[in-house]
Amino acid sequence: MKIILANPRGFCAGVDRAISIVELALEIHGAPIYVRHEVVHNRFVVNGLRDRGAIFVEELSEVPDGAIVIFSAHGVSQAVRQEAKDRNLKVFDATCPLVTKVHMQVARASRKGTKAILIGHKGHPEVEGTMGQYSNEDGGIFLIEKVEDIARLPMQDNDDLTFMTQTTLSLDDTAETIAALKEKYPAIQGPHKNDICYATTNRQEAVRELAKLSDLVLVVGSKNSSNSNRLAELASRMGIKSQLLDDPSDIQDDWFNDVKTIGITAGASAPEELVQSIISRLKEFGANTIEELQGLEENMFFEVPKELRIKEVN
């Protein structure tokens, strides 16, 4: 069997920054460091940080007063920020700057009283944080996931409307939903370029090319990773068998029936270390050649908070 590697794949700038924030906070301040929600959606990464002293919680009520807490890359609502401030928690914010950009769009709509429509997945922490930027009772923010949801929106054609999207959605599904929104609400405003981030876009485009050459596409990523799930879905829609896996232990013998070429990619929160461990396992199943596709070079970089750039000196 032959292995073909997608490019780009794996960590994006926002994930790199978020992990660095937790690592630096542990190095500078020592354990325990509390993290609200999984800092990124990858089991391997989270377990590694937990082993080093990070404590992952879902609510700030689980964090002692005055402790250090890190907000995950997915962002938090204004209510969570206020709660942290009221309880005198020391906060390091690992929210991806591209998520923060969407937060600013929602906050702007809230200040103006413009009704907002967010395209995203209900229950995802990024969506909860983004929805939580809207506080104007004279307007409102409404969540839709697909074209069919548009019919139940309560707004009128002449309402002042704007839309924004979760950053990790399917490019194809989102384009279809935006087109349907504009058809129903011709005057609706939105971002000049959709809010789906560069890493999601690049990895989906890379999988399109990978799937054309593969009998099976393996996506390295955790089940709760939105962008990883979209990669597996995209390959399946192209008629190619696909599997989402956390690590080599997930690999099953029957995946390789009639498979001559295996394509491998990784979600934006999956480290290259996992990709290489899966390649090693595939060699045991008979994979004997590896090819890496050419792809877009990514050079995006996001700084960590200033307080974490220089070690404290006693």
Curated annotation (Swiss-Prot):
Enzyme kind, highest EC tier: oxidoreductase
Catalytic activity: isopentenyl diphosphate + 2 oxidized [2Fe-2S]-[ferredoxin] + H2O = (2E)-4-hydroxy-3-methylbut-2-enyl diphosphate + 2 reduced [2Fe-2S]-[ferredoxin] + 2 H(+); dimethylallyl diphosphate + 2 oxidized [2Fe-2S]-[ferredoxin] + H2O = (2E)-4-hydroxy-3-methylbut-2-enyl diphosphate + 2 reduced [2Fe-2S]-[ferredoxin] + 2 H(+)
Signal peptide stretch: none
UniProt keyword terms in alphabetical order: 4Fe-4S, Iron, Iron-sulfur, Isoprene biosynthesis, Metal-binding, Oxidoreductase
Binding site for [4Fe-4S] cluster: 12, 96, 197
Cofactor: [4Fe-4S] cluster
Listed GO MF terms: 4 iron, 4 sulfur cluster binding; 4-hydroxy-3-methylbut-2-enyl diphosphate reductase activity; metal ion binding
Active site positions: 126 (proton donor)
Pfam families, per the entry: LYTB
Family classification: Belongs to the IspH family.
HAMAP family membership: IspH
Protein name: 4-hydroxy-3-methylbut-2-enyl diphosphate reductase
Species whose genome carries this gene: Haemophilus influenzae (strain PittGG)
